[in-house]
Design a protein with these regions (language model features):
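Flexible, compositionally biased loop and terminal segments
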Residues: 1-257
Length: 257
């Protein structure tokens, strides 16, 4: 690292410290959703492989959760694998699934996070299903950030699964379709989502400069604030995170009003 890079790094750290010092923790979002985009483009820009990009993105996760802990965030939803990602070439998908499984094991072993899977388990390899179940059981009583790992997740699929779950539940209770139809409410559907009774995201961060949601938590983000960051996920820094929090705190949330 040359002198210019060292000075730039020092200035960024000083700036981050200043932003953090002015941050009102009472205005910090309690639930943050993250669309961790840009692993492949980061790798290409670095002249490296796609797999290396995914590994670099995975290594950023614990660091990010540490920043969330420092600022009193209570719930984080990390979109690790979408239902659309299963269409990727096998030579990329296979290693990516292995990296994601390692992430889940690492989060569970850390002891600071409570891991919860959101997504369709049946889409995942049996080994990953087992890893997710073990991680949830091992961290069920951890008093720390609730980390939703969105793996095999799609927003439309979540709503379809919620409706299916609602119908199955009604059938098991002997409820007629007529009675079910009359009892359907927004709250009832919400309770059957992957996130259940969790609070909806206050803030959704998407990295890489893309300004679209791609189906992320379609139901839960009706009143969420969005922050689009130009930085690729593996290069996401604490100062970028703090800027997102500062931007969120400066907004006036209308909740549809």
């Amino acid at each position: 690292m040359n002198l210019r890079d060292k000075l730039r790094g020092l200035l960024v750290r000083l700036y981050a410290r200043r932003v953090e010092g002015h941050l009102d923790h009472a205005q910090v979002p309690k639930h943050i959703g993250v669309i961790m985009d840009g692993n492949r483009r980061w790798a290409k820009a670095a002249g490296s492989t796609t797999v290396h990009g995914h590994r670099a993105g995975a290594e950023k996760i614990e660091e990010f959760l540490g920043w969330c802990s420092e600022t009193d965030v209570e719930v984080v939803t990390l979109w690790l694998l979408s239902t659309d990602n299963f269409d990727r070439p096998q030579d990329e998908l296979g290693p990516l699934l292995g990296i994601i499984e390692d992430v889940v094991r690492t989060l569970a072993a850390d002891g600071r996070w409570r891991v919860h899977h959101v997504g369709t388990p049946d889409l995942l390899p049996s080994g990953m299903q087992t890893t997710l179940k073990e991680a949830e059981e091992a961290t069920a009583h951890v008093d720390g950030i609730l980390v939703n790992v969105a793996i095999g997740y799609g927003g439309r699929q979540e709503i379809a699964d919620a409706v299916r779950s609602m119908i199955v539940d009604a059938h098991d209770k002997g409820t007629s379709m007529q009675d079910l139809a009359e009892s359907v409410t927004v709250d009832l559907i919400g309770r059957h989502l992957y996130t259940g009774d969790q609070p909806d995201p206050d803030l959704v961060i998407r990295t890489s400069g893309e300004q679209r949601l791609s189906g992320f938590m379609l139901w839960q983000t009706a009143h969420s604030e969005y922050y689009f960051c130009e930085v690729f996920w593996p290069a996401f820094r604490k100062v970028d995170f703090l800027r997102a929090l500062r931007d969120y705190a400066a907004r006036h949330r209308r909740y549809g009003g």
